[in-house]
Amino acid sequence: MTTKLKGLKELGNTSDPLRTVSYQVRTKMSDYEDDNTDVQSLTVEEEYELWNSNVPVMYEFVSETKLTWPSLTIQWLPSDGQSPEQSLIFGTHTAGEEVNYLKVATINLPAGIAGLDQGDEEDEANDHSSFAIANKFPHIEEVIRARYMPANSNIIATINGKGTISIFDRTLEESKAQVSTLAFHKENGYGLAFNPHISGELLSGSDDTTVALWDIEAAKKPKSILTSHDDIVNDVKWHEFESNVFGTVSEDKTLQVHDKRVRLEPVKKLPTASPFNTLSFSKHSRNLLAAAGVDSQIYLYDMRDMSSPLHVMSGHQDSVTTVEFSPHTDGIICSSGSDRRAIIWDLTQIGAEQSQDDADDGAPELMMMHAGHRSPVNEFSFNPQIPWLLASTEEDNVIQAWKVSMKLVNASPPAISDPSLLV
């Protein structure tokens, strides 16, 4: 059965506080026709309609929800893998017009999208997902970043526009859910990351140029403070294999790698031509690091020798806001940017031969471009349980959940990448 795709274009200017349009895609590759439209000449709305018409060839599932206020942050929560219900966290940015909230939403996926075995007829009867707010907790100032603690996903940390960190327990009732406040930073903060190896250990980075290391289970003062940056700290991330190692990027045009056992100076400090906004350590290869920023490029580094990048990937047309490695598939990266795009990259295709037509469409490692947003993408998140399922949030009050077509995934030619990228 082929499901007709409809309804997304009706969502754009609704005044409803929360409205979702979603569908599970059931189609054949032959249903897609390329009309050779010149994308460069299209308006934002025309680009969106073109993307909507191409959805059948690119996705298994798409859900779009219009919010009352924009969210600057989004993250899937882990699930038990036995139910089609998935949860995610996001926040509000009301610019002082209303109370801000940290929110927990649930989205009920079609069973097939969630990877659960269900009969075709029953699955088709449940093609549409539902998006609902399960919990919301009052929040002082806007929610800049929200992150769950890997050791206990009921514990969520946030950082606001004044640099204040709040710790929530989402199992508690609304009035008691904020269990502690961590005050040190003097300005806005975009860096926030729990150590995946040590329960309660949290990093924060701020516009005040400092990075703070916290133990949220022991004290309300930082364990240590790093002052090695000279300008705004844009992002902080923990290494996926080493519990003492983390990275930071800053407006001071440096990428720094730190070892928390060495308190004074970074163990590696890389000057960059322009500031990086974001960085990510590979979840599969202990020496691989990605970073990106205002020049729109994605840089790949070998941590054993960071004097020059292993490879630079081009595809975005504006500043990159987020970059993350897939938790499921080695060599897969996603990036999002102010150009309204999220791009999935396949590092195994670096250096692959291309026809001229393919080369005109982008580098061989550019696997897929998600063009469903109509304003800059603030952040995205890989679902930790379901491969190829992502959620993304944009400036224009919209959250999208989307799963890449398995036909697109399986269409990739054999891997020929430089093995050094995957060590």
Swiss-Prot record:
Transmembrane residues, as ranges? none
Q: Which InterPro entries match?
A: Histone-bd_RBBP4-like_N, WD40/YVTN_repeat-like_dom_sf, WD40_repeat_CS, WD40_repeat_dom_sf, WD40_rpt, WD_repeat_RBAP46/RBAP48/MSI1
Coiled-coil stretches: none
**Pfam families per UniProt:** CAF1C_H4-bd (PF12265), WD40 (PF00400)
Which Cys pairs does UniProt list as disulfide-bonded? none
List site positions: Important for interaction with HAT1.
L288
**SUPFAM superfamilies linked:** WD40 repeat-like
UniProt keyword Cytoplasm present: yes
Question: Which interval of the chain is the signal sequence?
Answer: none
One term of GO molecular function? histone binding
Which superkingdom is the protein from? Eukaryota
Q: Primary place of residence?
A: cytoplasm
Region (Interaction with the histone H4 N-terminus) residue ranges read 357-361
| GO BP, sorted A to Z | chromatin remodeling; regulation of DNA-templated transcription; subtelomeric heterochromatin formation
Q: Where in the cell is it found?
A: Cytoplasm; Nucleus
**Segments annotated as WD repeats:** 138-174, 175-224, 228-268, 271-311, 315-355, 372-412
Q: Does the keyword Cytoplasm apply?
A: yes
Q: What's in the keyword line of the UniProt record? A: Chromatin regulator, Cytoplasm, Nucleus, Repeat, WD repeat
Its cellular-component GO annotations read:
chromosome, telomeric region; cytoplasm; histone acetyltransferase complex; nucleus; Rpd3L complex; Rpd3L-Expanded complex
Quaternary structure (record): Component of the HAT-B complex composed of at least HAT1 and HAT2. The HAT-B complex binds to histone H4 tail.
What job does the chain carry out?
Regulatory subunit of the histone acetylase B (HAT-B) complex. The complex acetylates 'Lys-12' of histone H4 which is required for telomeric silencing.
- What family does this belong to? Belongs to the WD repeat RBAP46/RBAP48/MSI1 family.
UniProt xrefs under PANTHER family = WD40 REPEAT FAMILY
Q: Protein name, please? A: Histone acetyltransferase type B subunit 2
Question: What is the organism of origin for this protein?
Answer: Eremothecium gossypii (strain ATCC 10895 / CBS 109.51 / FGSC 9923 / NRRL Y-1056)
